[in-house]
UniProtKB/Swiss-Prot annotation:
SUPFAM superfamilies: Purine and uridine phosphorylases. Pathway: Amino-acid biosynthesis; L-methionine biosynthesis via salvage pathway; S-methyl-5-thio-alpha-D-ribose 1-phosphate from S-methyl-5'-thioadenosine (phosphorylase route): step 1/1. The record marks 220, 275 as: Important for substrate specificity. This is S-methyl-5'-thioadenosine phosphorylase. HAMAP family: MTAP. It comes from Candida albicans (strain WO-1). Transmembrane segments: none annotated. PANTHER family: S-METHYL-5'-THIOADENOSINE PHOSPHORYLASE. InterPro entries: MTAP, Nucleoside_phosphorylase_d, Nucleoside_phosphorylase_sf, Purine_phosphorylase-2_CS.
Length: 344
């Protein structure tokens, strides 16, 4: 993302002020929920709850990989469809991108019965046509993380290789693309009619929209940003990995929706981005993200029954190690994700 001019204010405080809403006292919600929850939303910077839904439970889930970023809120639509929500960076955004407990996050959602995840993330734009406040539905990923983040549930003594040629779920991507009208649904359209939601089909001539995932927490140098553009990068963030890889291993359909806040540092013709600009874009993105999420939850409830089914059982046959050679403690650990796959 681009360079910031602070103008004497604290960025994190302004961001929190910009996304503040009157909230239900979640602490008073029940700490248990009976029944499966098939859809989850993971919120990124600027999206810390789903205000259009009705919270019914707040869960603290311990996994074989520790605790997730925070409590998971179960909410229902007006029709009664349940959705799990988890704030990736914690309720107070106190987790660095490299410190997000992604394995615990995905494992906890899997434990709830989640079959599909719609994840939101703020991004910097690497292309002129992807403007601040635009939304992007990426189809490919380039990994520029540094190996700091655990990116697999498997480990020495229990080896598996998940397919990742299509890092986002094609059926979930299509459901999202088909659900959002090309015009008029979200605020922020240009006068020339360019859609706010950039998809492979409607804005990129059928070419992939590629997200670069960098380690952070520092932003890119200008040279790095130009390199990513030369690779065909569309947007850049610090969050899509290992989240997408772990979702694939957990046999959960996954799609990220990116919310552009600014141009990355490649664009010298742009004025340095001020805090006020970023906060304004975050606020607009947050409102649009909530509207988009509400629409997609209804679409998933109506049409998403088959999404994720083609992934079920895939990891059972992705294991290279003979189960007879795996230590019992490793099998017990993986039983959290895959009960019944391997005899303990």
């Amino acid at each position: 993302m681009a360079k910031l001019v602070l103008k004497g204010n604290n960025l994190s405080k302004l961001i929190k002020m910009s996304v503040h809403r009157e909230k239900i006292d979640l602490a008073k919600l029940p700490h248990h929920y009976d029944g499966p929850v098939t859809l989850a939303v993971i919120g990124g910077t600027g999206l810390y709850d789903l205000p259009n839904l009705h919270p019914v439970a707040r869960l603290t889930i311990s996994t074989s990989w520790g605790f997730p970023s925070g409590s998971i809120t179960i909410s229902k639509t007006d029709s009664g469809f349940p959705v799990a929500f988890l704030a990736r960076h914690g309720a107070h955004h106190d987790l660095l991108p490299s410190d997000v407990p992604s394995r615990a996050n995905i494992a906890a959602l899997k434990k709830l019965g989640v079959k599909a995840i719609i994840a939101f993330s703020a991004v910097g734009s690497l292309q002129q046509e992807i403007k601040p406040r635009d939304f992007v539905l990426p189809t490919q990923i380039i990994d520029r993380t540094k190996g700091i983040r655990p990116s697999t549930f498997f480990e020495k003594g229990f080896v598996a290789h998940a397919m990742f040629g299509e890092p986002f779920d094609l059926k979930l991507n299509k459901l999202i693309s088909d659900a959002i009208p090309s015009k008029g649904f979200l605020e922020g359209f240009d006068t020339d009619g360019t859609p706010v939601l950039h998809t492979k089909e409607n804005t990129n001539n059928g070419e992939d929209l590629t997200i670069i995932c960098m380690e952070g927490p520092q932003f890119s140098t200008r040279a790095e940003s130009r390199l990513y553009r030369s690779w065909g990068g569309s947007v850049i963030n610090m969050s899509v990995l290992p989240e997408a890889k772990l979702a694939r291993e957990a046999e959960i359909a996954y799609q990220m929706i990116c919310m552009s806040t600014d141009y990355d540092s490649w664009n010298e013709s742009e004025e340095p981005v001020t805090v006020e600009t970023v906060v304004g874009n975050l606020k607009a993105n947050s409102a649009n993200a909530c509207k988009l999420a509400a629409k997609l939850i209804d679409e998933f409830a109506a049409k998403g029954g088959e999404i994720g089914k083609d992934l079920q059982g895939s990891m059972k046959y992705a294991v290279s190690t003979s189960p007879h050679g795996v230590k019992k403690e490793l099998l017990e650990k993986m039983h959290f994700l895959f009960p019944g796959y391997w005899e303990v």
